[in-house]
Structure formats: structure tokens, C-alpha cells
Amino acid sequence: MTRRILLACTLAAAAAVPAAVADNWPQWRGPKNDGHSAEKGLPAEWGPDKNVVWKFKVPGPGSSTPCVWGDDIFFTSIDGADVALVCVGTDGRQKWKVKVAPAGKSGRGDEGNDASASCSTDGKHVWAFAGNGKLACYDFAGKEVWAADIQRYGKFRIQFGIHWTPVLYKGTLYLQVMHRETQSVVALDAATGEQKWKADRPGYGKGESPDTYASAFVWEGPGGPLLVAHGNDYCTAHALDTGAEVWRVAGLNPTSNGAWRFVASPLVTPDLIVVPSCKNGPTVAFNPVGAKGTINPENPAELWRFKSTPDVVAPIRVGDIVYLLGDGPLTAVDAKTGAQVYRQALPAKQIYRGNMVAADDKIYIVGREGVGLVVQAGKEFEVLATNDLKEKVYASPAVAGGRLYVRGFEHLYCIGAK
């Protein structure tokens, strides 16, 4: 039996029997792609020498978020002149490291280097995507199963590097490919890398606006699942079997600004999708159940439009509140009405690049300067702790097995009660 046939059988079995992912963090935004973990009892306080179970010296910088399955942690990293895929055990010891691709030129002081997209895993294999366009599948021993060149859909022409993270769903990898040379969404067989379909995605952005740094997600709900893509002035949904467009959110670039690049990804939940834009644009929320056509204030699916938006960090929902994080304030918005609950400055003066994570009614935030904040979820603004790792962090935290993992430019930290 060939490796690809064996992998196809493995993926089919995984799709038939839902994986026990409660203790894992299989993709960039967690088990349900919404930034939530069911873990309880995570420490609110940590530092270089406090509640750090271990720290692992990473080969180099990168903003990819670790994915975790069982005893294995995977992430990509710059490693000299290469992009490497690294596997570290939950004991903090390296299991293996393999070269994925040569590394290209970094953008904006390593904010846009070729180790920006995050990995995905199903517990048997791990998929990594490098900034030169190589998307590859590896087994848990680090052996490459297949590789594909995403630049076959158009030579990359994007200002700050490739950040799109492929989403793994029931044996298929879905990827949005959006820059000045092409606007499309594609579906690849996760077992072989072969294309299932490619759908063109028209947009009307000009100048820099076609450049997109957000990632696609799969929405699950009545009438779904659907692939949700975000970029080039619109957020769209596509049928998983064909890529056909089902709906699109309009009015995200109301002034047709030519520098309206989307970085923050949408929040996708069964009964609410929250769509950020950028800079001084709006945030749009709507009910995706049965949604069709153009989502705008005249469409009954639309619930609210908020006057401002996060520019980089994806929204997160805890209970009946949606949280929007900018470089200074944290804004809480009523999930049903869009009314502002509070808008408060965070105590750490830093830029935020990684996404928020929610666990045990707390929101975990780590900024670019390595200062982590734990905020109590609810209608009252309360910062429970401010924690400084004293190194740059662009990645989002990951939660698995009772541990919080924070990937910095120098170390991967495992945080937990010792």
C-alpha cells in the first residue's frame, strides 16, 4: 500500500469517527476554530521564572502558532536560511526538525517572514505551509508525504508576506489565495495534495487592498458547513464541495480606500459570524443560518455594524459578549445588539499581533513585547494579571493538556502550575 493510499484511508477513518480533541489544539484557532479551550485551572500569572514548566529554544523567529496533539507540539520557524518544521514533546525536548523550504526576505522586522502560517494536524499527520508557497504533509516522524506549490495559482505578489493558514476539515485542506495576482479559494485533498476544486473570488479592491493576511475558516451550522474567506473588500462563504459562493458581506470598505488590506480574520460560530475590516472601518455581525446573497443593512441576516474594528487581532466571543482588540483598547460589544459594553485601555503599552484565547471565563492576550494579560470575561472590565516574558511574541497562544503554550521569537514557553 502506498503512503498516499494509506494516508487517504487514515483520513477517511478520522472523518468517520470524531477525534477526541478536547485536550488538543489541532489548528491555529483551536479545536473549533473560535479561539476557545475547555481547559480549566490555567494559571493567571506567569513570568520568566514563574509558572513556566519549561522553555524551549526555538531555531529562529516566526509568528506561526503551535498546534498540539497528545505529546507532540508542531510549529514552523526560520532556521538560518530555511523554514523548518519543528516537533517538540510536551516535556520540552525536541523530537525532530525538518527543512520545509528555503526562507525568503522577511517583511517588517520578521512580522512577515516565511514562518508565519500555522500548522494543522489530525493526530496522524501535520501540514505545514511556507512563505515561498510550499504546502507539505508530514507524518509524526517528520517524513514528508507530499508537497504542492501554491504559487501554481499565481506568483505571489504581496507586500508583507504570506500569512494565510490552511484549514483542515474532514480530509480536505481549504486555503484562500489572495494577493494582487490572484483572488481564489482552493480545496486540496489532505491525503495527496491534489486539487479538488478552485473557485475564483471576484473583488473590487484597488491598490494594496487585494493583499490579504487573514485566513479562511469552516463554518458549521444549519445549512452548512461552508468555507468562509476574507479579503479584497469582502467576506464570502463558499460551498465545500464546489467553491460556489453563497453569500458575501458588503460595505467593509465604504470609502474604496486603496490601502484597505485585511489582516484580522473573522470570528465564526454556529449562530454568529463577526467580520472585521481594517483601520477605521466597521465590524459587521450577522446570523449565518440561512444567509444568502449580499449581507448589508437591508438583509435580515445582518444583526449590527459597529463603528470601529480590530486591525490585526480576530474578534473572540465569550458568552453574550464579543471582544475587539486594538493596539490600545479592548472593546466589549453585546453580541446580540452591537451595543458597546465597555472600551478600556490595557495596562501594557504594546502592539498586538497574536489572537486572543478564551478558557475558563478568562481571556488570554499576549502582545508583541511579550507582555501577557489575563482579563476576566464579563460586562465589567477587570485585568486579573499582567505578565512579562521579556521577549517578542507575534504568535497566538495555544492551550492543550492543562498547559498554555506561548511561542516567542526566542523560546517556546510551556506555562502551567508546577
Language-model segment annotations:
Residues 8-16:
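Bacterial N-terminal signal peptides
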Residues 19-418:
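Noncatalytic, solvent-exposed loop/strand surfaces
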Residues 1-9:
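Bacterial N-terminal signal peptides that target proteins for export
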